[in-house]
Amino acid sequence: MSQEKNEMFESEWSKEREREKQLASGLDTAEKALKAESEELQKSKSELICLYNEVHNLPGASESRDHFLIACDLLRRENSELETKVLKLSQEFAQLNHFTLRGKTAPSNLITSENICKDPESNEPVLEIEIQSPKEEREELCPKLGERKQKEIPEESVKEGSFPREGQKEEGSQQNQDMKDEEKEQRLTMKPEEVVRLREELSRINQSLLQSQSSGDSSDDSGAQYPSSGDKLKYNQQGEVQQLHQNLHRLQILCNSAENELRYERGKNLDLKQHNSLLQEENIKIKIELKHAQQKLLESTKMCSSLTAECKQSQQKIKELELEVLKQTQSIKSQNNLQEKLAQEKSKVADAEEKILDLQRKLEHAHKVCLTDTCISEKQQLEEKIKEATENEAKVKQQYQEEQQKRKLLYQNTDELHRQVRTLQDKENLLEMTCSQQQSRIQQQEALLKQLENEKRKYDEDVKSNQELSEKLSKLQQEKEALREEYLRLLKLLNVHVRNYNEKHQQHKIKLQKVKYRLTNEVELRDKRINEFEDEIGILQHKIEKKAIQDQITAQNDTLLLEKRKLQEQVIEQEQLIHSNKWTISSIQSRVLYMDKENKQLQEISLRLPATKKQKEIYSTEVCTCNNAELQHEDESVPKATEKWKHSEQMETTISDILESEVVNEILPLSNSSFSGKGLVESFVSLQETDDIKSKEAMASSKSPEKSPENLVCSQNSEAGYINVTSLKETHGIQEQDQKSEL
């Protein structure tokens, strides 16, 4: 039920908001129309003043002045009526603004009503307050609507003394507004009393709950030895008590929100008072302006009286002229001319009268549209005045007919009359132009009146919508009464539940104490276990950290050991290379020395014991082959093998030269013998340098184990060469022994 009511509230408030928006748009249009009307009224006032000045400046046109004065009076009355309508519209606009401000505060009340519907048991008084507030607004709006309807009824009579009456009406409306403001203040002062009453009720409920709890505690102490088995009922009752506390808290919050709303409304009322004071100041200014306008009208009436005096003076002058006409009865021709001119003037006067009648008809038609009853009386007055004017015209015509005989001597004044007639014609043309302008303005005012009628229709529609809202408010009041009944029923149920709770609370208190003891013991045991587990966790974490550090250290040691092994292998390989290189160098040096010695011996033998050419050639070929074989075995891995081959070829050429010429053998210098030895030493040194370079490259690239077999091969080749040299030495030794035996 509460949800359905909430939905109903929301739908109604949404509709009211849409209507308020429509009213706001209508108010804006009304404001614009009022501004336009005020501007047009000011323009019409200025134009009327100009017309008055023109009429006063017209000399010798008394009849036309009377007609125009009548028309000006009518226009003044119309302006006064329009001003009254403008004031009414402004008052209605202010009232509608006040209504829209109240409508804006309505959504905040809606939010509070939604919260209240959720808790119908605890928030019943707040609903009553909120339902009373739209009632009060309705009561305030009803007299306002009646006043508006009364203001819409057209006034039956508008006379010359309308200005002071309008001022009295404005003062009466201001007094009514002041009375309404005072009533609102009194209502606002009453609302805090309701808030105080709600607070007292809340305090009473709190006290009753505290007393029930205290009585429950005392009964628990007395009946501690009789435990019962209604645990479920106990928990349910505790939940109900908690809900009651929550409801009380919500009531306190709602009271605070109501106080804030009251403060907000008071501030609003102060703002409205300021606004009313400003409006009063504006009304005072408008009154002052009206007084100035009245003073100007009085001045214009004085000017009219002065013009009437001038007309009388002109009539006296005309009489004097008539006397002169009686004396001058000589010119008959001038009489005829004057008669013709008078006939023309009469025709012009008739035309002017017809135009005036047309203007009067148009004005009467405009007055019929604006004012129904007042125009009839004014028309009668105008008809009487017109009759009087026609009678005066007839009398004047009779006087003119009587005085035709007397105007025979006015021939001298004809030129002056011609001039006056021309000036009058010009002024008549100007007056016709002004009349046409006034007609156009009257049409504009008629259009404005139509707009105002449309706005009145809209206002009637708003009144109907307000009636519908009043019906809805009556429905809400009925719902409020139903909620009140539900509230009383719930209060009775609450009292029953509280009694049951007090009875059962005594039984459950003992069980709660036992459960508390058990829980405290279990909690202490759990705390001890938790502390033990925390200590064990700290120890395990410390061990885990140590293991992680040890694993890191072992991993780093493994990597370092692998690097160390690699470096040791590289160092061993380098040492082996150095050792092999040293051994090869020492073996080569020994061989070189041995070869030098053999060469010296061979030179000595070749000098001492000349043999046959064939033996020498065989011996030289054997030596060359041996040397070539040694050089090939030693220099396979060396890039400078070509140089050694060149040295061997040079040796062959030298040996062949020695065998060919015996003379040269005796004079052979020692440089040739030393040449081969030194060249071999240099070649061995170059080989040693190349080996050092290769050993360094092996250290850098760490790939020396692949080169160790080559070194072994070189060493084997060098050993083979050494064996061959020894065998050659043995052969040389055998040959020397044979030669000695032959000698």
From Swiss-Prot:
Which residue windows are transmembrane per the record?
Answer: none
Using the record for this protein, list the coiled-coil segments as residue ranges, or answer none.
Answer: 21-98, 165-580
Q: Where is the composition biased (Low complexity)?
A: 208-223
A Pfam family = DUF4686
State where composition is biased (Basic and acidic residues): 1-22, 133-193
Which keywords does UniProt give here? Coiled coil
Instruction: Tell me which InterPro entries the record gives.
Output: CCD-Prefoldin_beta-like, DUF4686
Q: Which intervals of the chain are annotated as region Disordered?
A: 1-25, 114-193, 208-233, 695-715
Q: Which family does it belong to?
A: Belongs to the prefoldin subunit beta family.
Q: What is this protein called?
A: Coiled-coil domain-containing protein 30
- Cite the source lineage: Eukaryota, Metazoa, Chordata, Craniata, Vertebrata
Q: Which gene encodes it?
A: CCDC30
